[in-house]
Curated annotation (Swiss-Prot):
Belongs to the BioY family. The keyword Transport applies. It is found in: Cell membrane. The keyword Cell membrane applies. Probable biotin transporter. It comes from Rickettsia prowazekii (strain Madrid E). Keywords: Cell membrane, Membrane, Transmembrane, Transmembrane helix, Transport. The chain crosses the membrane at residues 30-50, 51-71, 73-93, 102-122, 134-154, 165-185. The lineage of its organism: Bacteria, Pseudomonadati, Pseudomonadota, Alphaproteobacteria, Rickettsiales. One of its GO terms (cellular component) is plasma membrane. InterPro entries: BioY. This is Probable biotin transporter BioY. GO terms for molecular function: biotin transmembrane transporter activity.
């Protein structure tokens, strides 16, 4: 009997906790940020290690966050990810961390994420969410990511090499990731309608 009472209490307490989360937006926002950071971390570890910047699955997760979070929340999520990485938690590509990694060849892309994610979130709110618009918004976001990355890399290896190493070699994988996200987003949206 005692076991049953304890189990019921836990279930009731869990229901109250879920109710509390749904009414307290600050806690819900914190939970979303933590979940987003974990997702970005996990996608950071799926890499094709090329130099000077590895290809990762970041951008698919960043698009998901940009399309499901508000502009403010998407910005805070990537800012939190960058902050904990710079502070030493090994969340960056291939479990890297620290200010030296951030100031290295990938730093410009992270700054691009800070700008591009809120831009995608804002555009998502302004345009109808169909396959074409979703794809265009993702291309705009990726253009911001790559532009910041190229500018950052150019200060280290020169503009011509930065365009090649920081953009051209990423075009095929970037297009594939955008298409994956666009198809995934359309599929999820169709599921919601049913």
């Amino acid at each position: 009997m005692r076991y049953i009472m304890n189990s019921l209490f836990k279930i009731l307490y869990l229901n109250r906790f879920v109710e509390y989360l749904s009414t307290n937006t600050y806690i819900l926002d914190i939970v979303k940020i933590v979940m987003g950071v974990i997702a970005i971390f996990a996608s950071s570890q799926i890499t094709i290690p090329i130099k000077p910047v590895a290809i990762t699955m970041h951008s698919v997760i960043l698009c998901i966050i940009a399309f499901t979070y508000s502009p403010r929340l998407s910005f805070l999520t990537i800012l939190t990810f960058i902050f904990i990485g710079v502070m030493g938690l090994p969340v960056f590509c291939q479990f890297s961390s620290g200010i030296n990694y951030f100031l290295g060849s990938a730093g410009g892309y992270y700054l691009g994420f800070l700008i591009g994610m809120p831009v995608m979130s804002v555009l998502k709110g302004k345009l109808a969410e169909n396959y074409l618009n979703v794809t265009i918004i993702c291309i705009i976001g990726h253009a911001i990511f790559y532009l910041c990355g190229i500018i950052w890399l150019a200060s280290m290896i020169g503009l011509k090499q930065a365009i090649y190493s920081g953009f051209i070699i990423f075009i095929p994988s970037g297009l594939v990731k955008i298409l994956i996200f666009s198809c995934l987003f359309s599929y999820i949206k169709n599921l919601k309608r049913k």
